[in-house]
């Protein structure tokens, strides 16, 4: 939660079936994006545009 919205972020390795998706049911949004061989899902009671901004803001570091 950021104090305004309640949401969860999940990051998994992308598969061949992974694709960008957006689902809005009532106040709940499920936004999935695929980037850098990762599938990023944001789930919560927030606007779709906010879910997209959250997933776009995630940065990956190289493994050490």
Predicted regions and their residues:
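N-terminal "mature-domain start" segment
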Residues: 1, 58-64
């Amino acid at each position: 939660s950021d104090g305004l919205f309640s949401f969860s972020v999940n990051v998994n390795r992308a598969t061949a079936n992974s694709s960008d998706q957006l689902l809005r049911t009532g106040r709940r949004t499920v936004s999935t994006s695929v980037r850098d061989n990762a599938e990023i899902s944001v789930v919560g009671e927030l606007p779709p545009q906010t879910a997209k901004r959250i997933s776009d803001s995630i940065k990956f570091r190289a493994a050490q």
